[in-house]
Amino acid sequence: MVADLSQLVKAYDVRGVVPDQWDESLAELFGAAFVQVTAADAIVIGHDMRPTSPALSGAFARGAAARGADVTLIGLCSTDQLYYASGALDLPGAMFTASHNPAQYNGIKMCRAGAAPVGQDTGLREIRTLVEQWSEGAPQPPASPTPGTITERDTLTDYAAHLLALVDLKAIRPLKVVVDAGNGMGGHTVPTVFKGLPLDLVPLYFELDGTFPNHEANPLDPKNIVDLQARVLAEGADLGLAFDGDADRCFVVDERGAGVSPSAITALVAARELARNGGKGTVIHNLITSWSVPEVVRENGGTPVRTRVGHSFIKTEMAEHGAIFGGEHSAHYYFRDFWNADTGMLAALHVLAALGGQDGPLSELVAAYDRYAGSGEINSTVADQAASLTAIRSAYSTRDDITFDDLDGLTVTSTDWWFNLRASNTEPLLRLNVEARDERTMTAVRDEVLALIRA
């Protein structure tokens, strides 16, 4: 098919409606282009539970093999399980998933050997160009005289063992945990990873179903964790965990059913990773995580490094600084011991170890890491984003004790509060995050900024 790749190839991945925007013929071209751009002689491929995933990943495999690459198929897996395979086997990888997007969508997340990201500046632009040319009839390079082999391999047990070796769970007290897999890949990975741990596991929506019959598999949207919150309370559970569709993100709910801020989880895991590393090391966090994160990092002997929002920035900084851990307020958690890739499962194991290693409830445990009042991210439709950012800067430039920085959008910081305004890359939106030392101040700053934006 001749496709509009401008709508299909995003900043970090490929994503679109099947078969309207892409199909198996295009997937085969992506496989060939991936091998050509990465110069790979072998690759690994995994896929999620979407109805179209097996056929699309199979077509990608054929395209790669035709270019002479040996293909290892690991079948059904979470995205972080694919990253594990890419790291452990030292092979470029492709994961077929559209995370929490509706059933008619599918996509490809690609990485180089060692789970190094493939984004626009690291190969995706070249892959897109080749696929565009070939889909429009340009001749492809001749097929390899010796096509690659296609073999299957199960990596789930090895993936689980790798994660469990990174967190000491031997001495934890028994815990009751409700896990909402959202009919996504958490239903595939959680039983194997949690097997043998002193956990009373209450599974919620573990049946793999790419039509998402119960709720969207996006735990950052409050309406999607309502069932989990209710079940935690009904079961008297110690905590709840919610995974997104491809199970690379994990959201935590405490024993009262209250969502735990991903910034608090970032701070908690950072403290534990620093302790594992002898009380030293660099931790990367994006600029909309809480003030709590750099504070906790410094208190535990580490060096915080602040970066832009977006996983490619975190992974780049992780590599540059040799960081031990990185966290985003979107519930992505990155680990040096996991090839700088993100794994919500490893973050979940850290939470279980921290909670099970003491007697108090999770709400008390995370209170030490959740020190400020946050607004969450608030979107406003704005036609001229640049003009709006300039107006906001002008409005605050005459005030005392104000600093500005432009690392990502505009961050305005005062003694007792800060806010960040970022323009969306894809929509006419400004995204606002506010944090303050107390709820009253946060609300006042939030309302003032929103009034200026929406005037």
Task: Show the residue positions of the predicted features.
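A short, gly/pro- and small-residue-rich
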Residues: 104-129, 253-269, 339-349, 355
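An N-terminal, well-structured beta->alpha segment
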Residues: 1-62, 66-68, 92, 149-175
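Proline/glycine-rich low-complexity loops and linkers
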Residues: 125-160, 255-329, 333-335
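Short glycine-rich phosphate-binding loop at a beta-alpha junction
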Residues: 41-48, 72, 176-178, 281-287, ...
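Phosphate-binding and adjacent anionic-ligand microenvironments
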Residues: 239, 279-455
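N-terminal small/polar loop signature for handling phosphorylated ligands or for N-terminal nucleophile
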Residues: 43-106, 164-165, 192-253
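Gly/Ser/Thr-enriched, mixed-charge loops and adjacent short helices
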Residues: 106-235
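Short glycine-centered, acidic/aromatic-flanked micro-motifs in structured strand/loop junctions
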Residues: 46-47, 179-181, 214, 254, ...
